[in-house]
Amino acid sequence: MGLDKVVKDIMDKAEADSRDITAKAAAEAAEIKKSAEAEAKQIIAAENARAEQAISKMRQRELSSAKLDVKKAKLNSEKDVLAETHEAFVRQLSTLPREKKADLLQKLVKLAKKDIPQGKIFTNAADADLVKDSGYEYGGNVKCIGGIVVTSVDGSVNLDYTFDSILEDVWTSSMKPVSDILFGSR
């Protein structure tokens, strides 16, 4: 029976070694699984953080874009209001009563006489008769709302006192105050 005992001892040792190896493998597998799960949690957390950051940036871009769109729309509507206001001034000047227009033209002629005592005067066709007694030779018609253009005898000096050019000068220099009145100070 000596051989049986040796075989049994070898088998017992093999089973014990097998159990040890299995236990070690199971412990190693558990450790690998635990490590993999921890790494997976870190990866998921990092990806979630990246996704949140991307969403936050996207929201910020959308908000900035919306604010810019609102600002553009506001500026466009203000531009439209200013254009309508300008057109209202043009309409008012175009429809001045004849007496008022004659008075304004006389004042403009008087102003022009300071710089050009003699020369030619130009007006729109409707106002030609209002400047016949101006002391200037009538030079013809110009396309304008009203007012006068005076040219020296030699043609070297021109004065543009048309309502159009006066309005544009006043409009340009008064743009900020007009905007402040219409839209409030910014």
From Swiss-Prot:
GO molecular function: ATP binding; proton-transporting ATP synthase activity, rotational mechanism; proton-transporting ATPase activity, rotational mechanism
Gene3D superfamilies: ATP synthase, E subunit, C-terminal
GO cellular component: plasma membrane; proton-transporting two-sector ATPase complex, catalytic domain
Keywords: ATP synthesis, Cell membrane, Hydrogen ion transport, Ion transport, Membrane, Transport
Protein's cellular compartments: Cell membrane
Membrane topology reported for the UniProt record: Peripheral membrane protein
Keyword Cell inner membrane: no
Domain of life: Archaea
Purpose: Component of the A-type ATP synthase that produces ATP from ADP in the presence of a proton gradient across the membrane.
Family membership: Belongs to the V-ATPase E subunit family.
Subunit structure: Has multiple subunits with at least A(3), B(3), C, D, E, F, H, I and proteolipid K(x).
Name used for this protein in its record: A-type ATP synthase subunit E
Lineage of origin: Archaea, Methanobacteriati, Methanobacteriota, Stenosarchaea group, Methanomicrobia
